[in-house]
C-alpha cells in the first residue's frame, strides 16, 4: 500500500532561499515540495507541479504541435527537453521513485474550442429559422472535426514527451484527464478518447503508465472506453466523482488502482474511511493491497502550505495503517464508532460503492 499526490501543491514559504522569478526560486520550491512529501511518507513523489501548476506552459508548447496538423518538431522537442529536465532535477533530489504527470490528449483537445450552444441559445440566436439552424449544425460538425484533429495531434505530441521520459529512465508517467467526465454516452466522444489514448500509449516500453481521472465521474463513458488503452494502473478522484467506484470495480485485477480520497477542503476524511476505501479497492478483481494506493482527490494548490502538509501527512499515515496486519497500534489508531452503517449508507462517511 502506498500514498501519492494526484495534483499540485501550493507554493511553499521560501523565505530568502532564492530570488523571486528566477530558475533558482523554482528549484527551491520543488525541493521544499519533495521534502514535505518525503516527511509524510509519500511515494511515488512528484514535483508538486510547482513549475507549471495547470500545465499551461506544456499545453502551449504542445499547441504548436497541434496547431496546423503538420506536427512541427520545434514545439514538440522543447516540450520533451524541458519536461525531462524538470523530472531529472526532481529525481536527483530524492532516493524515492519520482513520477511525472502530464495532461491528457482528450482534455488538451478541448482547449480553445468553443462549446456547443444550448438549444435555448440557438433558438434566441437563430430565431427558429431552418437555414440558421442548419448553419449552426454545420459549425458544430466543423468544431467537432477540428477538436478531433487537435486531440490526435496532442496525442502525438504527448507520445514524444512520454518516449523522451522513458529514455531518461522515468519509472512512472501519469496522464491526467480532467474532462473525461464530459464523454458520457456519446459514441463519437468515446471513440475519440479511445483512439487518442491508444495513439499515446501503444508500444511504449519501460515506464509504468497510469491514467488519472480527475474533475468528476467518467463512469458514464463506460469501462470499455476508459480502460481500453494499455495503462498499467488507473487513478480516480472519488470525491468529485463518487461513481468512479464503478470503474474501480471493473478494472482488471492485474492493473493497479489509486483511490483519490483526501480532498483539498477544510474537513478531513476520517482515517477509517481511507482504510475502508483502500481495502475495498484491494478486494476488487482479486487485486490485493500491493496494487492499491491512496491518493489526493485532485490537488492542494488551493490550500495554505500548512494545510497541504497536513493533508499529505494524513495520506501517508493512512497508507501505513492500511498496510498493517491487525495489531494494537492499528487498533489504537482507529475509532470503531466513526462509521455507522446508517451514515455510510447515506454517503456521509464513505465514498459510494459501485452500483450493481
Regions found by a protein language model. Name each.
Residues 1-356:
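Domain-level signal for soluble alpha/beta catalytic cores
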Amino acid at each position: 500500500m502506498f500514498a501519492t499526490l494526484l495534483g499540485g501543491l501550493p507554493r511553499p514559504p521560501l523565505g530568502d532561499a532564492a530570488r523571486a522569478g528566477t530558475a533558482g526560486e523554482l528549484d527551491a520550491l520543488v525541493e521544499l515540495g519533495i521534502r514535505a512529501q518525503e516527511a509524510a511518507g509519500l511515494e511515488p513523489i512528484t514535483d508538486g507541479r510547482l513549475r507549471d501548476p495547470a500545465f499551461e506552459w506544456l499545453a502551449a508548447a504542445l499547441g504548436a504541435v497541434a496547431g496546423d496538423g503538420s506536427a512541427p518538431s520545434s514545439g514538440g522537442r522543447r516540450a520533451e527537453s524541458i519536461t525531462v529536465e524538470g523530472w531529472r532535477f526532481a529525481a536527483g533530489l530524492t532516493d524515492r521513485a519520482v513520477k511525472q504527470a502530464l495532461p491528457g490528449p482528450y482534455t488538451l483537445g478541448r482547449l480553445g474550442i468553443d462549446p456547443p450552444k444550448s438549444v435555448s441559445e440557438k433558438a434566441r440566436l437563430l430565431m427558429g429559422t431552418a437555414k440558421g439552424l442548419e448553419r449552426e449544425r454545420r459549425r458544430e460538425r466543423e468544431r467537432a472535426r477540428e477538436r478531433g484533429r487537435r486531440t490526435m495531434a496532442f496525442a502525438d505530441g504527448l507520445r514524444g514527451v512520454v518516449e523522451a521520459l522513458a529514455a531518461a529512465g522515468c519509472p512512472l508517467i501519469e496522464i491526467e484527464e480532467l474532462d473525461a467526465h464530459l464523454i458520457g454516452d456519446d459514441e463519437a466522444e468515446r471513440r475519440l478518447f479511445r483512439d487518442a489514448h491508444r495513439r499515446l500509449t501503444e508500444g511504449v516500453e519501460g515506464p509504468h503508465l497510469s491514467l488519472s481521472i480527475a474533475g468528476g465521474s467518467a463512469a458514464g463513458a463506460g469501462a470499455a472506453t476508459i480502460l481500453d488503452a494499455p495503462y498499467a494502473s488507473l487513478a480516480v478522484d472519488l470525491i468529485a466523482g463518487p461513481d468512479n467506484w464503478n470503474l474501480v470495480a471493473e478494472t482488471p485485477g492485474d492493473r493497479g488502482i489509486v483511490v483519490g480520497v483526501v480532498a483539498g477542503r477544510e474537513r478531513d476524511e476520517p482515517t477509517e474511511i481511507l482504510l475502508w476505501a483502500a481495502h475495498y479497492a484491494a478486494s476488487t478483481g482479486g487485486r490485493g493491497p500491493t496494487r492499491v494506493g491512496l491518493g489526493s482527490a485532485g490537488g492542494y494548490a488551493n490550500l495554505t502550505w500548512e494545510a497541504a502538509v497536513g493533508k499529505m501527512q494524513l495520506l501517508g499515515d493512512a497508507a501505513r495503517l492500511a498496510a498493517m496486519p491487525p495489531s494494537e497500534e492499528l487498533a489504537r489508531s482507529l475509532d470503531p464508532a466513526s462509521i455507522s452503517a446508517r451514515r455510510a449508507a447515506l454517503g456521509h462517511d464513505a465514498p459510494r460503492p459501485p452500483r450493481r
